[in-house]
Structures are given as structure tokens and as C-alpha cells.
UniProtKB/Swiss-Prot annotation:
Positions marked as site (Priming of reverse-transcription by covalently linking the first nucleotide of the (-)DNA): 96
Organism of derivation: Heron hepatitis B virus
UniProt cross-references to SUPFAM superfamilies, sorted A to Z: DNA/RNA polymerases
Protein name in the entry: Protein P
UniProtKB keywords: DNA replication, DNA-binding, DNA-directed DNA polymerase, Endonuclease, Hydrolase, Magnesium, Metal-binding, Multifunctional enzyme, Nuclease, Nucleotidyltransferase, RNA-directed DNA polymerase, Transferase
Reaction catalysis annotation: DNA(n) + a 2'-deoxyribonucleoside 5'-triphosphate = DNA(n+1) + diphosphate; Endonucleolytic cleavage to 5'-phosphomonoester
Length: 788
């Protein structure tokens, strides 16, 4: 193509070339291929089959990309109907006919360690995020409950019993790790591990853990309290438990063999009331109120007596084994006193609740350790339904590990259907932002959180909404599950707060995304040192690091978020390119593919598209198939175009230099005419072949200026052109225009300041008062990531 002189845009030879190019663009716009062939067809016809289906692929791929794009005009892809179609495209399968999960009776339950972060991290890592995390709250609009026996999905009908048994083992492991609550009654649950501060006020004293179920036992009268001696039977010792009769004090003694007996020793109210060894004490908290003038027991002795009462109540089984009437009534009375005690809000004194795993001195001996193993009891401010809200099943850990099982929880009722919730959005960097924030030329280390979601505690009332079951026992998630749309948002808040503290405390560039951390520093030695310090810092607060997935030492090339990041560039691994090329080669031209299968194919193409010379408009036919939910058929030329995209692999530069060149070319258009003006004073006016929408006429002139002058930037008064949203245009023209303007800077200029506005009105161009601005959207980068 001859290059025109910028001072003489009105040369006849250049004008003839420009007229030819303009007519080609207009023909591309006016072609109705998209309006006719890309509409959903009612039936599959023979014309869908491409005549070049058997042609070799590679010779055509060697052609330039612009030539391949033009060839698709004569052989476009097609949309079909909703009849059953192929669900397999290479290794990709449609979601309707995914490969069935195979049950493995020898599945191993993975090791699930207790994950409990210390609340001291709130003071060490100050952030506003903690108020959303301590505890996290989940309030669905409405809930659909299912019966307990349907808690396990019948994924493997032939192995349902074995499946439920493995699910039971898995849930028990989660319960032992403190991740689940286990239902005891309508108002009572139990859990393992240390408690949180918001759980403390709802705790039932562990001293009465064996009788905790009696709190809600309606068979026992709630009005029963400590029975006083008002009966007429004076000699019945079972009726005067806990009462003082004429100075006699009824004491309860524990014998060596574990049985109990009553003693009726007469004691002076001012004398020592504790028995030998402190194993027995005067019982009767109501007796002091009955005789206030005769019993002035000091506070210390009363506290000691209550402690012995609690020690006695830990052994209900021995009491019930005794067959005497008096002992039976004592046990019933003691149960009622426990019930009365647990109705009051529980506040724990220092050292009264040893946390699980601590090895402090226990004054109560092995009994306290036994209660610790049994877990803590929680009487929440909500009811715990004997129903489930999510169904569960087991699958393979991943495609590479089929020996271990993974628990899948289906809480989809909260994300779709009538109970669908709108979960909060959070900042997620796209590829352009990631290129801007990653520092250049620094060694890097990546860290990975282990069991990341299980670091996030839930409020007890929210836990009651997340109920699962193995078919027999009901469990509630005490920590955030992975099957709820709120969990990624909570994890983002959690890692963001930690990442900000790591960056300020250790003077290192830190970026966190979900459960991944990326640390960068100019000095490899310093980075290696602080990586160990960071791991120690996190582990001190109970945050677990997956050392198998972290980088042991600083490296220059690292894999992060699916990208391969070096000192200066980022690219996609070659293995992913090979897999995608293999999928494209296995496309059968002219055959119908289900839109769900096409949807998965689009996802893979979108991930690699920024690293190619293509654009998003090339995938528009497949997007149309997914939008209309109809089948899709590839043509031979379209298959070649997709394969051509995978051949032009490129790598992206980190921290690219943003240049804003001075504009030297301006374009303008009316419904009938278009003009191109150069800063040197030359201009050219063109007449359109027909009247079209003004935004299409403006785009035609910008494309013509790019083809004929090839400037670095162009002035235009069309916001439609500046935003480059061409999805509503005919497909071939949109794909060609997007490809043509990919690396071109477009400036918006008001119409009255547009130099090309004059030639369209038969006036000379005016470059003296040009006011322009780029309309590109500014990239949002958090303040703490803008330092480097």
C-alpha cells in the first residue's frame, strides 16, 4: 500500500486507495451473515456441514491472522436448536453429562487438624475487617429444610451404606477438629476445642457435661429445687436433704469404693463444716435462706462447698446404681440443682475452663481431662433444628489423588432459586491490574494457607442455618464451609488484614488473593529470612501454613494464580497451551455441541486470550450459543481461527510503560459524509454509500484512518468508538474493527473542538483550540500496593 504524504492527504492516488478501503469496510458492515446465519436455527440442515471439513489444518494456519479472519466470512459457525447434542469436546464435558463419580470403598479420610486462630491477632493486626470476621454472620432470606435421613446424597446407590459410613467418619473428623457443632437437643450442641469469646456467654458448665441433656428434659419438673424439710414424716431422711433440723446438718460423704452415704453429725454453725479431704461438704444452698440467724457461713467456705457439690455431680452413674430410696432422691435433687444452675448465664473465671490441648495443672484430676475429651456444651441464643439445609457426598480428592476423599457440601439453595442471596463483592485484580502491581526484577516467595476456610468462625445463630447430616446425627458448621457464596468474601477479608500487617511489620511487598500470599523484596537473603519469620508469626496465632505448596526459598520464576511470573514478564505455562491445542484439534467440524460444553470451552479460551493476538469478539458466536442455550457447530474456517490464536503466543511485560502520544489525526462523520484531518493541515472528505447509524459511520472513519495513515492515536468525538464496545455490531465487522484498533490510543474531543468537524461542513480544519481526554477507565489499585 502506498504511504501518503502527510502534507497532501488530497492526492488523487491516495484518495483512490482510501475509497477502495472504505467500500470494503462498508460491504463488511452491510453483510447480513450475522443476522441470518448466526440466528438460532429450528433444525439441523445439510448446509451446516462445511465442505472443507477434511482439509488439513496446519497449511491454513500459516496465513496471517487478518487473512484467517476474512476467510471466516465465507464459512461462519452456526447456531442450532435445543435438541440433545455432543457433550464431549476433547477432555471437556458438558455439565449435564459429566463423568460419573466412582465410589471407592477404600477411600481414606484426609488428616484434618484443629484450626483455631487466636483472637489476640485482632490486637496484633489492627484492621476494620475483624468486625466482620469475629464472628462472621450468615443470614439467608429464607431456608428450605430437608429431613435428616436425606442428608447424604444418593450419589452411589449401590454403595449407599458404605457411603454413609465414610461420610460419618469424615464428619466425626471435622467435629474432632472443632469445625462442626454436634446436635444434642433443640437448644444444646457440643463442640471440641477452645471456645471463642462470643461463645463463652452461651456455654454450659463442663462440670455438668454429663447431665447437660437434662437441661431440656421436660420429664423432670423445672419447679423442683432444693427440697426443704416441710414433710410431716420427721424420720424420713430422704425428705430432708439439704435442710437443717434443730441444728443437725445433713452431709454427704463419698466412700472409698465410690458409693455415697448420708451422715447426721451434729455440728455447730460456727465450726468447720468441711469434711476430711474436702470430698464432702454441707449441701443446701436453700438452707441458709431458711435459717439466716443460725448459719453465718463465710464466703470462702461457701465457695469451697459449691466446688465440692460440683465434684459430686460429676459422678451420676454411681449415684444411680445405688438402689436405696434416699440415694435416688438425692440424685434427682442434684439433677434439679444442676438444671437450676445452668439456667443462669455462665461467666467463666480465670482458669476455670482449660483450653483443649493445654497442659496446666488440673486440681480436679483425670475427671476434668475426661470432660475435655467429651467437648464443651453450648446453649446458643437460637434453636438447633433437627433438619438439614445442605446435602453432602464424597468424591476423589482430585484427579491426581484418588486414594483420599473430599467432602462436597451442596448449599446451592442459598445461591439460586427462591432462596438466592446477593453476596457482597470484593476487589479482585484482573490481568491488567496484576501487571501493574507486581514489582519488576525482585525475588519472590509464595505462601499457601492450609484449610483456609476453616479459619473463619461463624456466629452460633448463623451456624444453625448450615446444617448437614450423615443420615443419623445432625451437625452444624462452626467454621465457614466452602459451599456458601459468602465464604470467599470472608476469606478475602481475612487474608487482606493479615497481608497488610505482614507488609508493614516485615517491610516486604505483600499481595494476598484468597489463600495465597506473594512476598517480594529486592534482597533474596532478606526475603529468605523474613519468610521464616512470617511463618512463625502466623503460626503463633494459630494460622496454619501448607508447607507442601509454599516456595521454600526465593525464586525468580514463580507460578502464581495460574501464571508463570518471571522478573520482567508473565506468561502461561506451555502445558496449558498444548492441552488447549489438543482440544481444538479434536473439534469435529459440522457436528452439534451442547452449549454447556461450549461454555466450558469459552472459559479456557478466555484465560489465554490476553496472551494471544486475538480479541474477545472472536468468541462472540459461542457466546450467542450460550446466551440462547442452543447447540453450536464449528466451521472449518472458525476452527482454523481458534487454532491460529494458540499459535501466536506472547508474554506480557510487567509494569508496562503507559505513553500518551500527541494526537496528529482527527476523524469525524455525519450520516452522509466522513472526514479525516491531519495536524499539518491536510484533510480528506468521503461520501458514504448509504445512510447508517451515526456510531457506525464514526467507526468506519476511524478504521479508515488507521488503515491509510497508521497513526499512534486518533481524535474522535464518538464516545462509542472510544469505549470499544462493539458487541452489538455485525460479527465480522466487530471482530475486524476490534483487531484493527487493539493497540491504538483513542482520545475523545468535543464536537466543537474536533478539527475534522470543519471539513464535514465544507470548512477548513482548525487545530488551534484542541481539547481532548482519554476515556479509558482508571485501574483501581489499593493504596498499600502502590508503593513499588
Amino acid at each position: 500500500m502506498p504511504q501518503p504524504l502527510k502534507q497532501s492527504l488530497d492526492q488523487s492516488r491516495w484518495l483512490k486507495e482510501a475509497e477502495i478501503k472504505l467500500r470494503e469496510l462498508e460491504n463488511l458492515v452491510d453483510s447480513n451473515l450475522e443476522d441470518e446465519r448466526l440466528k438460532p436455527q429450528l433444525s439441523m440442515g445439510e448446509d451446516v456441514l462445511s465442505p472443507e471439513a477434511g482439509d488439513p489444518l496446519h497449511p491454513n494456519v500459516r496465513a496471517p491472522l487478518s487473512h484467517v479472519i476474512g476467510e471466516t466470512r465465507h464459512d461462519p459457525p452456526h447456531l442450532g436448536n435445543r435438541d440433545p447434542a455432543r457433550h464431549k469436546l476433547g477432555k471437556l464435558t458438558g455439565l449435564y453429562q459429566m463423568k460419573g463419580c466412582e465410589f471407592n470403598p477404600h477411600w481414606k479420610i484426609p488428616d484434618i487438624s484443629a484450626t483455631n486462630f487466636s483472637q489476640e491477632i485482632i490486637n496484633e493486626c489492627p484492621s476494620r475487617n475483624w468486625k466482620y470476621l469475629t464472628p462472621a454472620k450468615f443470614w439467608p432470606k429464607s431456608i428450605s429444610y430437608l429431613p435428616v435421613h436425606s442428608g447424604v446424597k444418593p450419589k452411589y446407590p449401590e454403595f449407599q451404606q458404605n457411603h454413609e459410613s465414610l461420610v460419618n467418619d469424615y464428619l466425626n473428623k471435622l467435629f474432632e477438629a472443632g469445625i462442626l457443632y454436634k446436635r444434642v437437643s433443640k437448644h444444646l450442641v457440643t463442640f471440641k476445642g477452645p471456645y471463642f469469646t462470643w461463645e463463652q456467654k452461651h456455654l454450659v458448665p463442663q462440670q455438668h457435661g454429663a447431665y447437660s441433656s437434662k437441661i431440656n428434659d421436660r420429664q423432670e419438673s423445672r419447679r423442683r429445687r432444693i427440697i426443704t424439710a416441710t414433710s410431716s414424716r420427721k424420720n424420713d431422711s430422704s425428705r430432708i436433704f439439704g435442710a437443717h433440723n434443730n441444728g443437725r446438718k445433713i452431709s454427704y460423704h463419698s466412700t472409698r469404693d465410690g458409693s455415697h452415704r448420708l451422715s447426721g453429725r451434729t455440728s455447730d454453725p460456727t465450726s468447720r463444716g468441711a469434711l476430711a479431704g474436702g470430698d464432702s461438704t454441707p449441701i443446701g444452698p436453700g438452707s441458709t435462706a431458711a435459717h439466716p440467724s443460725t448459719h453465718h457461713v463465710d464466703r470462702r467456705r461457701r465457695q469451697k462447698g459449691q466446688g465440692v457439690l460440683q465434684a459430686i455431680s460429676r459422678e451420676p452413674s454411681e449415684t444411680r446404681r445405688n438402689g436405696t430410696t434416699s440415694h435416688h432422691r438425692v440424685a434427682r435433687c442434684r439433677t434439679s440443682s444442676v438444671e437450676d444452675f445452668t439456667r443462669r448465664p455462665f461467666t467463666q473465671s480465670k482458669g476455670a475452663y482449660p483450653r483443649q490441648g493445654t497442659r496446666g495443672t488440673d486440681p480436679q484430676g483425670p475427671k476434668a481431662h475426661q470432660q475435655e475429651e467429651n467437648g464443651s456444651y453450648l446453649r446458643g441464643n437460637t434453636s438447633w433444628p433437627n433438619r438439614v439445609t445442605g446435602r453432602i457426598f464424597l468424591v476423589d480428592k482430585n484427579s491426581r489423588n484418588t486414594e483420599e476423599a473430599r467432602l462436597v457440601v451442596d448449599f446451592s439453595q442459598f445461591s439460586k432459586g427462591k432462596n438466592a442471596m446477593r453476596f457482597p463483592k470484593y476487589w479482585c485484580p484482573n490481568l491488567t491490574t496484576l501487571r501493574r502491581i507486581l514489582p519488576v526484577g525482585m525475588p519472590r516467595i509464595s505462601l499457601d494457607l492450609s484449610q483456609a476456610f476453616y479459619h473463619l468462625p461463624l456466629a452460633p445463630a448463623s451456624s444453625s442455618r448450615l446444617a448437614v447430616s450423615d443420615g443419623k446425627q445432625v451437625y452444624y458448621f462452626r467454621k465457614a464451609p466452602m459451599g456458601v457464596g459468602l465464604s470467599p468474601f470472608l476469606l478475602h477479608l481475612f487474608t487482606t488484614a493479615i497481608g497488610a500487617e505482614i507488609a508493614s511489620r516485615f517491610n516486604v511487598w505483600t499481595f494476598s488473593y484468597m489463600d495465597d500470599f506473594l512476598l517480594c523484596h529486592p534482597s533474596a537473603r532478606h526475603l529468605n529470612t523474613i519468610s521464616h519469620a512470617v511463618c512463625t508469626f502466623l503460626q503463633e496465632f494459630g494460622i496454619r501454613i501448607n508447607f507442601d505448596k509454599m516456595t521454600p526459598s526465593p525464586v525468580t520464576t514463580i507460578r502464581f494464580l495460574g501464571y508463570e511470573i518471571s522478573k520482567q514478564h508473565m506468561k502461561i505455562e506451555e502445558s496449558r497451551w498444548n492441552e488447549l491445542r489438543t482440544v481444538i484439534k479434536k473439534i469435529k467440524v459440522g457436528q452439534w455441541y451442547d452449549w454447556k460444553c461450549i461454555q466450558r470451552f469459552i472459559g479456557h479460551l478466555n484465560f489465554v486470550l490476553p496472551f494471544t493476538k486475538g480479541n474477545i469478539e472472536m468468541l462472540k458466536p459461542m457466546y450467542d450459543a450460550c446466551t440462547h442455550r442452543v447447540n453450536f457447530a464449528f466451521s472449518s474456517r472458525y476452527k482454523i481461527l481458534l487454532y491460529k490464536l494458540t499459535m501466536g503466543v506472547c508474554k506480557l511485560t510487567l509494569d508496562p510503560k503507559v505513553s500518551l502520544p500527541l494526537p496528529r489525526v482527527a476523524t469525524d462523520a455525519t450520516l452522509t459524509h466522513g472526514a479525516i484531518s491531519h495536524i499539518t493541515g491536510g484533510s480528506a472528505v468521503f461520501t458514504f454509500s448509504k445512510v447508517r447509524d451515526i456510531h457506525i459511520q464514526e467507526l468506519l472513519m476511524v478504521c479508515l484512518a488507521k488503515l491509510m495513515i497508521k497513526p499512534r492515536c486518533i481524535l474522535t468525538d464518538s464516545t462509542y468508538v472510544c469505549h470499544r464496545k462493539f458487541s452489538k455490531l455485525p460479527w465480522h465487522f466487530a471482530m475486524y474493527a476490534k483487531q484493527l484498533l487493539t493497540r491504538l490510543t483513542l482520545y475523545y474531543v468535543p464536537s466543537k473542538y474536533n478539527p475534522a468537524d470543519g471539513p464535514t461542513r465544507h470548512k477548513p480544519p482548525d487545530w488551534t483550540a484542541v481539547t481532548y481526554t482519554p476515556l479509558s477507565k482508571h485501574i483501581y489499585i489499593p493504596h498499600r500496593l502502590c508503593g513499588l
